[in-house]
Amino acid sequence: MQGDAKVIDYLNKGLRHELTAINQYWLHYRLLNNWGLLEMAKVWRKESIEEMNHADRFTDRILFLDGFPNMQVLDPLRIGQNVKEIIECDLAAEHSARNLYQEAATYCHGAKDYVSRDLFEKLMKDEEHHIDFLETQLDLIGRVGLELYTQKHIGGLESES
């Protein structure tokens, strides 16, 4: 089915964001794991995989609309050098995605592509949950301090692979 060119462009922008997020969350997962914050690392690994599912949904929709998914371009990764920076970097990326998805959903509605609109709205809802989670983590750090916050996320002595 031939899709609206601007809708396909928005879908590719969403795909680019998700591909970037996969890598950013994965590297943060590996950093957290390396620092011994195994419980926290598990959450970041799960987020990376969730972003992969989002990318798959964009890819599927682009192909359905006879577009071509551009998987060769990523945005610059925002990599934190400590726990608080990791959360701040991921929060900035999630806000960026939410803003894009809101703009895209509005355009798709006007273009009468309700399936693409619904996809953007569904993923926007997921991003809002991520934003809420990350803001809560920053609030906790502010209230209990970084040392106590990270202490809660230390795992066992076994290495995670």
PLM region descriptions:
Residues 1-161:
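Iron-associated oxidoreductase/ferritin-like identity signal
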